A protein has these predicted regions:
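Transmembrane beta-strands of outer-membrane beta-barrel proteins
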Residues: 77-82, 139-141, 198-202, 223-225, ...
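Residues on the lipid-exposed face of transmembrane beta-strands in outer-membrane beta-barrel proteins
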Residues: 70, 81, 127-135, 141, ...
Length: 336
């Protein structure tokens, strides 16, 4: 069954995306302080390029020291709206039903479900609020909504005790589709540093997603290292765009997602009328449960992205993922 697919979607919201760029200070080239915006927009600008406010904000802590070294720090607070689309393959280890019976006869071992290829697709929209607590450290919280589906190739066998297992033709080569939706929330932090126009960042976050067809929540941990370079872009008078910054990077995303899912059979729709009738008969009391164990075919994928810093207060970001997990990410951010 395709219940396992939800893991993928968790991971997608768990990616509270951010990126940063550090610039060598106008003075003291040996400085180790680097700062950036919440998204890859976090780019440091030399002090002479941007006028600092007359009364520097309290955050980030040690911000005065960074400014004294010639760095222009981004506004401390940010609001980010993100959209992410993920498609990935999943391997299912086992699917088990329990709580089934025909009268007083238990039928927990009646069905044997063999699962082939499984493909999951999900879309997640999130809103993230962040704050720079240190010139090189950003923390954030996020909340969002995930919606998607999975499709699995399955074959169902029926166990007949000492008679062995039969595989009815009408229960083989089925396409099992599972639709799901849920709310995702979480928190994370990003560390950044750089030399000249080169920058490196490390993002880590933890999320929980509550799905409409699962018991409890699904937990996910995501770790994303990135390395990139910052370019200065000319202004475009015809579009009233000032000179900006363009950050490009490569990276990788690691996902560790809870791999066991449980729920009620009443929330599932079987892929064929024949199988649905058999499950309904064995689950006449409505106590049937499912338990799915699975794992991602690959916890890592490759990322390529870019961020355009339009003004000091606004930037847009996009990122693509490929290899075992295909993903598309786009975000707009306002800093204040």
């Amino acid at each position: 069954m395709n219940i396992f697919i939800r893991t993928a979607l968790v991971s997608l919201p768990c990616m509270a995306f951010q990126s940063w760029a550090a610039m060598t200070p106008a003075t003291s080239p040996a400085s180790l302080y680097h700062y950036q915006d919440d998204s890859p927009a976090a780019i440091t600008t030399p002090a002479e390029e941007t006028k600092q406010p007359s009364s520097p904000p309290v955050l980030p802590f040690y911000g005065d020291e960074a400014r004294a070294r010639g760095y222009d720090l981004p506004a401390p607070f940010g609001v980010n709206i993100n959209y992410m689309n993920i498609r990935q393959n999943i391997s299912v280890d086992s699917i088990a039903f329990s709580g089934l019976a025909l009268g007083s006869i238990p039928l927990d071992n009646l069905f044997k479900i063999n699962v082939g290829d499984t493909r999951e697709s999900s879309k997640t929209e999130t809103v993230r609020l962040d704050v720079w607590v240190l010139p090189f450290m950003n923390v954030y919280g996020l909340v969002g909504h995930t919606k998607g589906h999975s499709v699995s190739d399955i074959g169902v066998g029926v166990k007949l005790g000492d008679l062995g297992e039969i595989k009815p033709d009408n229960l083989q080569n089925l396409k099992f589709r599972l639709d799901f939706k849920g709310t995702t929330y979480g928190a994370g932090t990003t560390f950044a540093g750089g030399i000249g126009n080169w920058f490196a960042l490390l993002d880590a976050n933890y999320t929980q997603t509550r799905f409409d067809i699962l018991d409890g929540s699904i937990d996910a941990f995501t770790l994303t290292p990135r390395v990139g370079y910052r370019f200065t872009t000319p202004g475009v008078d015809a579009l009233y765009l000032p000179a900006g910054k363009l950050n490009v990077w490569v990276g990788s995303m690691y996902q560790d997602v809870q791999q066991e899912f449980k729920g009620s059979l009443n929330d599932l729709t079987m892929p064929s009328a024949g199988l649905q009738e058999m499950v309904d008969m064995a689950n006449s009391k409505g106590k049937g449960r499912f338990d799915v164990k699975q794992h991602l075919k690959s916890p890592w994928n490759v990322l390529v992205g870019a961020q355009y810093v339009i003004t000091r207060n606004f930037n847009v970001t996009t990122e693509f993922g490929f290899a075992e997990r295909n993903s598309f990410f786009v975000a707009g951010e306002y800093r204040f």
